[in-house]
Amino acid sequence: MPKMKSHTGMGKRVRVTGKGKIVKQQAGLRHNLEKKPSTRTRRLTGLVEVAKPDVKRIKKLLGR
């Protein structure tokens, strides 16, 4: 049976930390930033951990 291929798109969107947590960039920082308050844009910077219900599916897509 051939090897499973990891989902390329998911691999570009998330990163697995050394301890196995899956982190992603928060949504809402691509465009229309002029109308958003600077407090909101600051809050949206940085990486956040993926929600618990999604972890199992993402790990399957990544082949882990």
Swiss-Prot record:
| One cellular component term from this protein's GO annotations in UniProt | cytosolic large ribosomal subunit
Q: In this record, what's one Pfam family?
A: Ribosomal_L35p
Q: Name one GO biological process term.
A: translation
Biased composition range(s): Basic residues: 1-22
Q: Which UniProt keywords apply?
A: Ribonucleoprotein, Ribosomal protein
User: What Gene Ontology molecular function terms does this protein carry?
Assistant: structural constituent of ribosome
Which segments carry the region annotation Disordered? Answer: 1-39
Listed name of the protein: Large ribosomal subunit protein bL35
Q: Which organism is it from?
A: Salinispora arenicola (strain CNS-205)
- Show the taxonomic lineage: Bacteria, Bacillati, Actinomycetota, Actinomycetes, Micromonosporales
